[in-house]
Amino acid sequence: MFLKSLEVFGFKSFADRTHIEFADGVTALLGPNGCGKSNVVDAVKWVLGEQSAKNMRAESMEDVIFNGTQSRKALNVAEVTLTISNEQGLLPLDISEITIKRRLYRSGESEYWINGTQAKLKNVRELFWDT
């Protein structure tokens, strides 16, 4: 099992839809200060169900939604999609790839999907119980 890709939109500093591919064996994120490395890690934690804003260096969960800049308007939604390789069958679904998506609206409503089917946080957590 390994992270295959991460797609981030409206999450923290990622105002534009950003797609990151990971290769099997990737163990580090490298880049200069302020380029978003910590926000990539926060995005992975968040899509997997992190409920503490403080664990993601934020005051409230709404703070993970892109808040705008002088040249860009704030967004009303944050969305992160994580694709995980399950070729070794370590997760309890009989498929080679599992996609988990989380979306948060400024209203506070949060939604989860597993492989395109709407799910609950409990379902996301259950995927990883035996890992």
Predicted regions and their residues:
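Gly/Lys-enriched N-terminal cap/neck module of very large, oligomeric protein machines
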Residues: 2-131
